[in-house]
Regions:
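Condensing-enzyme catalytic core mediating Claisen C-C bond formation in acyl metabolism
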Residues: 1-63, 178-270, 365, 375-380
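Conserved beta-ketoacyl condensing-enzyme motif
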Residues: 7, 57-125, 289-308
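Short beta-strand segments
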Residues: 8, 123, 148-154, 201, ...
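Short acidic, glycine/serine/threonine-rich loops at helix termini
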Residues: 19, 100-102, 133-134, 159-165, ...
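Acyl-CoA/ACP chain-elongation machinery
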Residues: 144-167, 222-231, 304
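Short, flexible helix-coil linker/hinge segments at the edges of structured domains or between repeats
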Residues: 159-182
Length: 380
């Protein structure tokens, strides 16, 4: 690769007003009209105090995922006419607004200031953010493109509405006995929220102000050895395999809540942190990076429970990534899946804390089928 790749600006778009914990079910609804039995436990464990929904209290959608993405992209530019210079748009999302056409097509359709350019969609869960970032990075590094916009967006609240769940989803057992058991039924309804984050990338840095140089992006999948852990549009079988929505009739799809997001919590407990730290150790060694040289670490975590578990495992392995270097805004903006890493980066980039030559490590796990990604940025 001949060209350096730089992040010249960052942005985030959080829809409507922040929603405090006691207002959540006003927006996503109550299953069978009853308050959730696990809500308070899940919120105590995840530590989130506010989040954003692209919803009204009538459970009406105010923004599509494509709209969230386009709003974040527009905030990258002081003048929207500058969008006409963009050569590539890469997008990430866990649950697009539609199956066809692509998410990138719908985002591009909301950016009339752009030209007939190349677009790219990534498919998956949280790691789609770094996948989209790497496509843009490689396109610029190779000389194929001079610049690119990369955006991750999530409209997940619409999939969490009470109308999509039946009363069985409320029957949780062993609440409070084990932190993981409290997650098993409707925990995801109180874990996920909406938003978008974007970055503007170029083969030249800013003339004034800070720029982030992308040193490398590294990812790995464990799907060759492990089954799916988080699914949507499918259902789990007893043997751990999944059955796709294509195998069900319309009544079965409704009865089984096939399109709701589900997670095998026991599988998550067994693997998510251990494999994540394995990956971190591997990429730091591969790229000859000393942990003590890292100035800031942005871990994408779904809850402060996993934040603590990750920190504990890193400390147990004597990896010098001290907590005083960690940065997260999870508790105030919520878990936005693929968008979270860019929204956190945007806040840190604009915080005034960064100094020239600071190194920033981005850490992103994906529990879909246990994939992990890491990126190293340098402030110049």
């Amino acid at each position: 690769m001949n060209n350096n790749v730089y992040i010249k600006s960052t942005s985030s778009y959080l829809p409507n007003n922040p929603i405090e914990n006691d207002r959540m079910e006003d927006y996503i609804g109550k299953i069978e009209g009853k308050p959730s039995r696990v809500k308070n436990l899940v919120l105590r464990q995840n530590g989130i105090t506010s989040r954003y929904y692209a919803l009204t209290t009538n459970q009406e959608i105010t923004h599509t995922s494509a709209m969230l993405a386009s709003e974040a992209i527009k905030k990258l530019f002081q003048d929207l006419h500058m969008l006409s210079n963009v050569e590539l748009v890469t997008t990430a999302t866990s649950i697009p607004d539609q199956i066809l056409p692509s998410h990138a097509s719908m985002v591009h359709g909301l950016l009339p200031e752009t030209k007939n350019i190349e677009i790219f969609s990534t498919s998956g869960v949280c790691l789609t953010s770094l996948q989209a970032l790497k496509i843009a990075y490689l396109s610029i590094a190779s000389g194929d493109k001079k610049n690119a916009v990369c955006c991750a967006s999530e409209l997940v609240s619409a999939a969490l509405l009470s109308k999509h769940y039946d009363a069985e989803y409320e029957r949780c057992h062993n609440i409070g006995e084990n932190p993981y058991f409290g997650f098993e039924k409707d925990f995801l309804r109180f874990m996920l929220s909406d938003g978008a984050g974007a970055v503007l990338m170029d083969n030249t840095p800013n003339e004034t102000g800070d720029t982030l140089k992308i040193e490398w992006i590294d990812m790995e999948s464990n799907a060759n050895t492990l089954p799916a852990c988080m699914i949507a549009g499918a259902d789990f079988n007893e043997d751990g395999s999944i059955t796709t929505w294509k195998s069900y009739n319309s009544h079965e799809i409704s009865d089984k809540s096939v399109f709701t997001v589900k997670q095998d919590i026991r599988l998550l407990k067994k693997h998510i942190i251990n494999l994540w730290v394995n990956h971190i150790e591997k990429v730091l060694k591969k790229h000859k990076v000393k942990a003590e040289d890292i100035n800031y670490i942005i871990p994408h975590v779904s809850s402060m429970f996993f934040y603590k578990e990750l920190l504990k495992e890193i400390e147990n392995r004597n990896i010098d990534l001290k907590e005083n270097k960690w940065f997260t805004n999870l508790t105030s903006v919520g878990n936005m899946g693929s968008a979270s890493i860019f929204v956190a980066l945007d806040e840190l980039f604009k915080s005034g804390k960064l100094k020239k030559a600071n190194n920033i490590l981005l850490l992103v796990p994906e529990s879909g089928r246990f994939s992990y990604g890491t990126a190293l940025l340098t402030v110049i």
